[in-house]
UniProtKB/Swiss-Prot annotation:
Keywords: Ribonucleoprotein, Ribosomal protein. One of its GO terms (molecular function) is structural constituent of ribosome. Pfam families: Ribosomal_L34e. Belongs to the eukaryotic ribosomal protein eL34 family. Gene3D superfamilies: 6.20.340.10, 6.20.370.70. This is Large ribosomal subunit protein eL34. The gene is RPL34. PANTHER family: 60S RIBOSOMAL PROTEIN L34.
Amino acid sequence: MVQRLTYRKRHSYATKSNQHRVVKTPGGKLIYQSTKKRASGPKCPVTGKRIQGIPHLRPTEYKRSRLSRNRRTVNRAYGGVLSGSAVRERIIRAFLVEEQKIVKKVLKIQKAKEKLAAKS
């Protein structure tokens, strides 16, 4: 006859957060062993892609004591938060905005010079 099993924790419903595995102990008994949820890993909020170079862990395992800083981040601006393509887009956009401001300023100065030349 098969041995009956009971949950070892108080949470008694078969939910996603209460998944278990049947394991045979060295004494020959069957027990429930709780399994951890699979980690999906960090995603870029802009592109939705996975961030390269960071391990897929549960959120609590990214804490200081469990994972060193160089494993938690990537060595660039917004490292470990945004994907490389999103960072590249941001840098290019910022550069183009600055260039546009400079062009606007130069055009304004040229227009002012033309007005002065027309008056005199």
